Amino acid sequence: MTIGLGHYLAVGAILFTLGILGIFLNRKNIIVILMSVELILLAVNINLVAFSAFLGDIVGQVFALLVLTVAAAEAAIGLAVLVVYFRNRGSIAVEDVNLMKG
């Protein structure tokens, strides 16, 4: 049995669904929401690489590397902002962040 395009798309769909569920089911912790967004981006990357390999075109793989770079920068900046916010406020609950003005 060979691993085909359908298998990669199924894994990507499962990861994407888990990321969406993580966002909708846990709205209290910002770190979990950030990790869920990263999971969604990982699912998109898996689909890009799978379609790229299936079609024999390298553009999807290059775009996946670009998305991976942007996702890493987004995670680093997001975690840095959360650390600074936690040091100032003492909490990272979504309700507390919604009260932030200005």
Curated annotation (Swiss-Prot):
Pfam families recorded: Oxidored_q2
Record InterPro entries: NADH_UbQ_OxRdtase_chain4L/K (IPR001133), NUOK/Mnh_C1-like (IPR039428)
Chain segments annotated as transmembrane: 5-25, 30-50, 62-82
Topology versus the membrane: Multi-pass membrane protein
Claim: Transferase is one of the keywords in the record: no
Domain of life: Bacteria
Name assigned to this protein: NADH-quinone oxidoreductase subunit K
Organism: Nitrobacter hamburgensis (strain DSM 10229 / NCIMB 13809 / X14)
One GO biological process term: ATP synthesis coupled electron transport
PANTHER family (alphabetical): NADH DEHYDROGENASE SUBUNIT 4L-RELATED (PTHR11434:SF21), NADH-UBIQUINONE OXIDOREDUCTASE SUBUNIT ND4L (PTHR11434)
Substrates-to-products reaction catalysed: a quinone + NADH + 5 H(+)(in) = a quinol + NAD(+) + 4 H(+)(out)
Assembly and binders: NDH-1 is composed of 14 different subunits. Subunits NuoA, H, J, K, L, M, N constitute the membrane sector of the complex.
Main subcellular location: membrane
EC number: 7.1.1.-
Gene Ontology cellular-component annotations: NADH dehydrogenase complex; plasma membrane
GO molecular function: NADH:ubiquinone reductase (non-electrogenic) activity; quinone binding
Keyword annotations from UniProtKB, A to Z: Cell inner membrane, Cell membrane, Membrane, NAD, Quinone, Translocase, Transmembrane, Transmembrane helix, Transport, Ubiquinone
Job description of the protein: NDH-1 shuttles electrons from NADH, via FMN and iron-sulfur (Fe-S) centers, to quinones in the respiratory chain. The immediate electron acceptor for the enzyme in this species is believed to be ubiquinone. Couples the redox reaction to proton translocation (for every two electrons transferred, four hydrogen ions are translocated across the cytoplasmic membrane), and thus conserves the redox energy in a proton gradient.
Transport recorded as keyword: yes
Localization per Swiss-Prot or TrEMBL: Cell inner membrane
EC class: translocase
Similarity remark: Belongs to the complex I subunit 4L family.
